[in-house]
Amino acid sequence: MASADHTRDPCPYVILNDFGAAFSMGTIGGAIWHSIKGWRNSPPGEKRISAIAAAKTRAPVLGGNFGVWGGLFSTFDCAVKGVRRKEDPWNAIIAGFFTGGALAVRGGWRATRNGAIGCACILAVFEGLGIALGRMNAEYNRPVAPVIPDAPASGSTSAAPAAV
């Protein structure tokens, strides 16, 4: 049985921290993405202005979407940890299932089911890759015993062979 992770803050702080981190990642990534998109889809002579305008209008929206996903996922992750009283990869997969379903619930039963299963599968792949990379990294960083040179043969102390 895995023990609780005491290196992180309590859940309310973790939820707010994850929401902010996801919002920041979405906003920065959205600014880069939408500025490139605005640059490419503008007439000559207005490329810089269009890139800035596209980034200013669309990046906060993408940041908000990322933030909602991160906050919901972190909330469900803390709830699952509290219910299961375990710290293992299944928590993230279950939280991903709930997050995908909650975000798609406005689309009806089929969208909720597909969103929940899809998000759980994505989180399962992420968790599996994390475990595989962790094992691979642990194998490379395994302690190795130092090489001890062989002891000289007994009875022969000189380096030169005896004369016959």
From Swiss-Prot:
The chain crosses the membrane at residues 13-33, 60-77, 89-109, 114-134. GO terms for cellular component: mitochondrion; TIM23 mitochondrial import inner membrane translocase complex. InterPro entries: Tim17. It is found in: Mitochondrion inner membrane. GO terms for molecular function: ATP hydrolysis activity; protein-transporting ATPase activity. Disulfide bonds join C11-C78. It comes from the Eukaryota. Pfam families: Tim17 (PF02466). It is a multi-pass membrane protein. Keywords: Disulfide bond, Membrane, Mitochondrion, Mitochondrion inner membrane, Protein transport, Translocation, Transmembrane, Transmembrane helix, Transport. GO terms for biological process: intracellular protein transport; protein import into mitochondrial matrix. Component of the TIM23 complex, at least composed of tim23, tim17, tim50 and tim50. The complex interacts with the tim44 component of the PAM complex. Essential component of the TIM23 complex, a complex that mediates the translocation of transit peptide-containing proteins across the mitochondrial inner membrane. Belongs to the Tim17/Tim22/Tim23 family. This is Mitochondrial import inner membrane translocase subunit tim17.
